[in-house]
Amino acid sequence: MKFDTVIMGGGLAGLLCGLELQKHGLRCAIVTRGQSALHFSSGSLDLLSTLPDGQPVTNITEGLNALREQAPTHPYTTIGASAVLELAQQAQALLEASGAHLQGDVQQSHQRVTPLGTLRATWLSSPEVPVWPLAAQRICVVGISGLLDFQAHLAAASLRQHHLTVETAEIDLPELDVLRDNPTEFRAVNIARLLDNEEKWPLLHDALLPIAKTCDMIIMPACFGLADDSLWRWLNERLPCSLNLLPTLPPSVPGIRLHNRLQRQFVRQGGIWMPGDEVKKVTCRNGVVSEVWTRNHADIPLRPRFAVLASGSFFSSGLVAERDGIREPIMGLDVQQTATRAEWYQRDFFDAQPWQQFGVTTDDALRPSLAGQTVENLFAIGSVLGGFDPIAQGCGGGVCAVSALHAARHIAERAGGQQ
């Protein structure tokens, strides 16, 4: 099977890269093993929140310039500050065109409220997520009886520190009793599958209405809206106060919705989606990828002109930690890591951990190397890259989006518009 590009990994980076390549008329296939990290994320994307020295980023242009000095191996430094800003704008437009209507601006980050009621700087977030400053003084944080993935009292306690009047309440929906037999089934995603049924909408409205009459804003867990935000908009039109939603513990409804929208758009535009499959081997001859072998296709290789590695970090098994080092399991690519195992971590759990910055090494075009030799038609994108800390620096989603479009640009230029 011949393709212009085979993308190994179906997360945020892989999907955005595929969508961008489709705009240039290239035939793409995505091989994905299972659920991506998006399913376990908040659905919000960070661009750059904090510099390596701990300074918060308030001006993205100045932040990128400072990052170049402090983190010379960061993917943003590799790509270049001006290109990062341009590609971030393109990524935002691509998300919008795919049906993911997110709020935010490249030049100015905003503060979103987290599930614990704290504030976190972010680039893009779902419109139902509350953004600081809140347009209300009297707030009620509402939980659902029996849902352990959201603690209303913790969120309320944090919000009270900002001199707001915050109360808590709990609603009981007997229609959800079918899920209560097994506590592991009483999760936000399973609740959403029931509540997204239009016949159930009035039941949720009736449960929230008495609370809505006593406050200016309701904040509750994001336990509906797997396909779209129709129910959220419907409730906001009918309740006497505004309604905002906070992501729960994983799996996350906003994260799943974002992934599903991108995946459906990729398939709608003619992309080949290979779910439940896994790349087992990549044939590389004279520094060029010629064949990609997957578990399900056995002795039938995929033959791409270009290949993209978007396999994720440790969470997605794109990187594997062993006693003597970190390795990239598909091809054994060169990995940026510390010399000894003792340097992998800091003893304080809440400190920035060095292992978070481990990943494959690349050139300026994001082409990785194998035994010191650059692989000419292979590009690495997303969390598999080294040189950045997605948690401490608040740049995980941004690196995925920007690196995906940077690689897609180089592939499109090399392909020359020829399929």
Swiss-Prot record:
Gene3D superfamilies: FAD/NAD(P)-binding domain (3.50.50.60). It comes from Citrobacter koseri (strain ATCC BAA-895 / CDC 4225-83 / SGSC4696). Pfam families: FAD_binding_2. HAMAP family: Glycerol3P_GlpB (MF_00753). It catalyses: a quinone + sn-glycerol 3-phosphate = dihydroxyacetone phosphate + a quinol. Belongs to the anaerobic G-3-P dehydrogenase subunit B family. Composed of a catalytic GlpA/B dimer and of membrane bound GlpC. Keywords: Flavoprotein, FMN, Oxidoreductase. It is an enzyme of class 1 (oxidoreductase). The gene is glpB. Its cofactor is FMN. One of its GO terms (molecular function) is glycerol-3-phosphate dehydrogenase (quinone) activity. GO terms for cellular component: glycerol-3-phosphate dehydrogenase (FAD) complex. Conversion of glycerol 3-phosphate to dihydroxyacetone. Uses fumarate or nitrate as electron acceptor. Its EC number is 1.1.5.3. This is Anaerobic glycerol-3-phosphate dehydrogenase subunit B. It comes from the Bacteria. Pathway: Polyol metabolism; glycerol degradation via glycerol kinase pathway; glycerone phosphate from sn-glycerol 3-phosphate (anaerobic route): step 1/1. The keyword Oxidoreductase applies.
